[in-house]
Amino acid sequence: MKKYFYPVIFEPEEVGVSVYVPDLPGCFTQGDSLEEALDNVQEAMGLFLEDIDPKDYPKATKPNEVDLEGQQFIMMVAFDKLAYDRKYNAKAVKKTLSIPAWLNNMAQERNINFSNLLQKALLNELGVTQQ
């Protein structure tokens, strides 16, 4: 999966930093420090984008086309959908599958964990490393 880069506006406050993502209307957060604000904005971007098909993600505005005011500054921030999903959408889901009875019997005799085997096979097939 690829990463999606968006310009993000950071605005220092008396206490902490406010953060806005102009290309994702209503996507904003804050943090007590710049580091915390960066972590929080990636989570906020994920919440905004999680129910949208990546092919329909809003197009990113060029950073030099974003208007800034006062102490605001802009940074390009990457949204990594795979990293977001691994962190926030790791809940197991049930899958129903069919295999020949003889294969099922052999696997059960050898105490094969079907869920574990399927996960490993899918990770391998998709070229994704386990983390």
Predicted segments with their positions:
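N-terminal segment of the canonical double-stranded RNA-binding domain
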Residues: 1-15, 20, 73
